[in-house]
Each structure stands twice: as C-alpha cells, then as structure tokens.
Amino acid sequence: MTIKWLSRGVSREKAFFVSETSLRKLRFWKVSELFMAENATDHQVKRELKTRHLSMIALGGSIGTGLFVASGSAISTAGPGGGLLAYVAMGLMVYFLMTSLGEMATNMPISGSFAAYSTKYVDPALGFAMGWNYWFNWAITLAVDISTAAIVMKYWLPNVPGWIWSVSVLVIIFLINALTVKAFGETEYWMAMIKVVTVLVFLVVGVLTIFGIMGGHATGLENFTYKKAPFVGGVPAILGVFVVAGFSFQGTELVGITAGESATPEKSIPKAINQVFWRILLFYILAIFVIACIIPYTSPDLLGSEASDIAISPFTLVFQRAGLAAAASVMNAVILTSVISAANSGMYASSRMLYSLAIQGNAPRYFEHTTSHGVPLRAQVATTIVGALAFITSIAGPEVYTWLVAASGLTGFIAWLGIAISHFRFRRAFVKQGHDVKELKYHAKLFPVGPLLALILCLLVIAGQNTGAFIHFDWEQILITYLSVPLFVVLFVYYKIRHKTKLIPLDQVDISSTRTEQRHD
C-alpha cells in the first residue's frame, strides 16, 4: 500500500499521510479542505457575509425598478395572461440558472464566480471574455443608476441640480463598499428588507382591493376577460415581454459573487438559492397578477410607466385605488432605495470581478491588492472612475453615453449563458472523472434539462431584443441593441488567438473544491 504526500510546500510537521485506499473513499472536496489554510494567500477577501446577508442579496437582486415600474408595460403589451406567462417562463429560467450557479458556487465559493468557472470548466478564453464584459457592464450600469437616482429625487426637489444627487449617491456607495464586506452586506440586507415589506404590503392591499374590501368596486378577474384579454398581441407580444422580464431578473447572479465572501458557503448558498423559486413566485408572479386584476391592460398609464413619472407606477396606481394617502411619495422612496441598492450591488460586483481577473492573471496585478479589511480598494477605485466618466458623458456627450450603455446592454444575459454552459460542462466532467453526483454538497434541479432549457430561453431573449429593427433593416438600432455581442466575441477571439486555448477535455477539467482564488502568473 503506497503512501503519498497530499500537499506541496507544506512543512513536514503539517503534512498529511493518506493511503491510496483511504483517498479513494474520501469525497473529492474534503481532500482540498485538509490543507485549505495552507493554500491561502495574503490579501484575500474576508468571509464575513452571513446566511441572512446572502438570502437577502439573492432576493434584493430580483426586486427593483423592473418590478416596481416596468411590470406595467409588460401587462400593457401582452395583456394580463401574456404578461404572467412571460414572467413565469423567465422566473423558471432564472431558477434553473441559480441552481446551476449554486451547485458550482457551493463547490468553489470564490469571488470570480461564473467567470472563474468558465475558465476552469470550459475554456480560459470564455472566462476572460465573461469577466471583462461583466466588469464593464456594472461599471457603466453604475452611471445609469446614479443618473436614475437624480431623476427620482426631482420628484421632491425639482429645482436642485441632478448632478448633486448623482455625486452624493456615488460617494455614499463608495464609502459603504470601502469599509468592509460586512458593511455592504448589512446595507443590502436592510434595503432589500424595505423592498420586501413594500411588496408584501402591496399584495395585501391588492387582494383587499380585488375583493372590494378597499377601493370600492370589486374587480375580481374581470380584467382577464376585458376586450382582447387575457392574451394580447399573440406570440410576438409575449416574446417582447420576455425581454422586459429578463431585464427585471438581472442581478440575481450576484449571489454567486458573494459566495466568495460567505462565512459558511456550504450552508448559505443552498439556502439562498432554494428560496429563489418561492420568492420569484411570491414577489413577481403574484404582484403582476394583482396589478393585472386591478388595472386593465388598456390603461395608458401602464404603457408610460418609468422612473421619471412615479405617479403612474403600477404600484402607485394600486395604492391610490385603495385610497392610501401619499402613495406616490412612498413609492418614490422605495424606488430610490432600489436604485441605490442596485448601484451598491454594482460597485461590489464589479470590484470583485476586477479583483478576480487580476488574481487569474487576466488583469494587472495591481488590482489584486486588498486592504486589511479584505476590500479590493484599487479595483473599486478603478470601477468608480470608469462609472464617473460614463456619468460625465451622459451630460457632456449623450451620444457617447448611449453607445456605452449599448455596449453593456446584453452582458447580464451573456453571463447567464456562461453559467448554463459552465454548469453543463462541470457536471459532465464530474461524472466523467468517476465521481458520484451524491458527493456534491448541493445539486442543481433537473439536470441536464434545467440548464439546457435556461440556455435556450436565454438565447431566445437575446435574439428577441429588437426584432423590429431586423424587420425594418434599421442597422443603427441593430448595432446599438446587440453591440454587447460582437464586443464579447472580440474579447473571446483575442484571448483565444493570443494564448492558443482550446476547449478543455472533460477528463482534464479541474473539478477540485477550493475556497480561495488561485493566482495564475
């Protein structure tokens, strides 16, 4: 019976001996954890996020202006039945994607998340392209969020210059993220709590209004049979709402990035992921059902819903219908919270992604440095500068800003594609290398149907972003809409040609479990 060393670079006193027979009996993930501490390097992020933080971040990432504002246009476009069907389909897709991400993140809870998984399980070129694309997306989205915050603030203080509010929000979220990851987690926890309470109150008020207990006339389900309802515009309209619904769920993948700083990822990630399905059902499907019951799809207010006119947010309209005073002001405060939360999450996600890219050798080593509190401050400063410059272009050069936003428009969907592909490869490699699925700490649902269905729906959403532009051969609109795709391809091809990478054979895929980012020189 041969004896082998299990670790490299470990002192004789700390080395472990395990027989080959015993090694075969150990679960693959336990082996790496025997010397996990020995592999840790200086300047790592800190694992200070608790289960409640991850659960609320997963929830908060799927509740925002997409629900509070854009849900009205979904009902107006496809009718109550079409709107519900589109959100159910997108919710199912997101659930499968999150269970796929959860399986990988529980096995390897690192800040690089799906970009790192693409590198390990598919092709380093894919991880490189996804990482930089995702970082750029959130850096630009940061500018969008602080601009939206200024629009929301004009509801109360229309005479104050908008840039003051934008700069104020940027400074606040920078300071929050610069403190500790726990400060970020606590901030997100309470902002998500505000959104959750708002939706719960809305559902209660909405149900009471439907039955006529509040707001006078009982609407019941009459709006589902009103004129052309429940399905309006047929399949094209439903496909159009897929796009709206898809954007509404953007950000749910953040839970994968927070896994890198979770104190107990084996416990926190499965719990957060398992709650996604019920939360999507409760907060999205039921909320849209309530709106559809109370407000007919023909209402012009639904089509015009946007952050600049909170008075016609579907949530505001329902609260006003129930006779609640100051509904618009309250919803404006909630939407402001959502915008700040999105900006806060964007700052966090982009700084961690840039940090991870540096660790992997795909970004300057300068950005892999962290403070004594585990904050990748240099990466955060770089992200803030890019976001601030993008914001300045929104004022000084609107056309440039439009193209910057277009360049990041589909990045979230591309990330979702990467999650589905990476998980499919991970599971196949896991089995190919002789492991039993039961060894995994968390199992994705309905594999391989789940990730394949998510992949197909995601491609459908990307393709359907602007079908009208193709019909009318509007090449400028096509370029603006789909600019993210060629940019992603350029990054992918550049890395592939420079480093001559290939699709990693299944029997060579590294499926080992680790909780630390591995430096690649």
Specify the residue positions occupied by each region the protein language model found.
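Helix-loop-helix connectors at the membrane interface of multi-pass transporters/channels
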Residues: A115-A125, I146-S166, T198, T258-K267, ...
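C-terminal membrane-solvent junction of multi-pass transporters and transport-like membrane proteins
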Residues: W190-M191, Y366-L377, W416-I480, K502, ...
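Membrane-interface "cap" regions at the ends of multi-pass membrane proteins
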Residues: I3-G72, S76-G81, V94-T99, S111, ...
